[in-house]
Amino acid sequence: MTLPPRVAIVAGSGLDLGGLLDRPLWEKPFSAFEHCAPAQVAGHPGTFAAGECGGIPLILQRGRRHVYEGIGFDALTAPVRALAAMGVGPVVCTNAAGGLLPELEPGQLRAVERVITWPCRRWPGQPGELLPDWLVPACDATGVDAWVPGPSYETRAEIGALQGLGAGAVGMSTAPEMAAARALGLRTAAVSCITNTCCRVQRLTHDHVLATARDASARLCALLRNALPDFR
């Protein structure tokens, strides 16, 4: 890039945010960066792409690793350290999440105001609660997310427990990256794409999650494009 990247955006399961790059400059696999292993899960390409969005230098992380893949915190968060080495400031995490509130519908975008880890977990260097530095504006909703290790979707009992903790959505990512970013002195924001509702009985598959996320990608791109100037 001709300028150091100012913002990093992490694209979650099925979220295609390539439309943010008005002027793509390069794209490289995770494995091209120190300690970064290839992504293993469908819907996670496992690349870094550099370019500009509205004149703002940007790094797009396409996909991520997960705790349920059986890797430790250092391996899980190696992409965050790679982003820090590239010189990014803010890290904006996006993810697919299940809605825990009856008013949340698939395809809605939800700004994350706090993340609960469940079971309660504190990662190395984590500075207290996982509180984003910004609330991404113009989302359909705002609230607390819960992180769970996965890979199984939640049971009815687990859904009730998470609701009791005050969570309105649940996912299997973002929390480790936020913890690593904060430990590195990087500011954060997060948006969840609601891909299913846990309040209705339904048969849920990963393919369903990916399809709903893909359908919401263009709207998420537009939302993030408008918010980028605020991430300084």
Regions of interest found by a model, annotated:
Residues 80, 159, 175-178:
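Generic hydrophobic/aromatic pocket-lining and core-packing "Φ" positions
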Residues 127-164:
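Active-site rim beta-loop-alpha module in soluble metabolic enzymes
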Residues 142-146, 170, 189:
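Hydrophobic faces of well-ordered beta-strands that scaffold small-molecule active sites
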Residues 172-208:
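Zn-dependent metallopeptidase/amidohydrolase metal-coordination segment
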Residues 83-87, 163, 182:
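Non-catalytic positions within long, well-ordered alpha-helices that form the structural scaffold/packing
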Residues 198-232:
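His/Asp/Glu-rich mid-to-C-terminal helical/loop segments that flank catalytic regions of hydrolases
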Residues 1-127:
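Metabolite-binding pocket within alpha/beta catalytic cores that recognizes anionic/polar moieties
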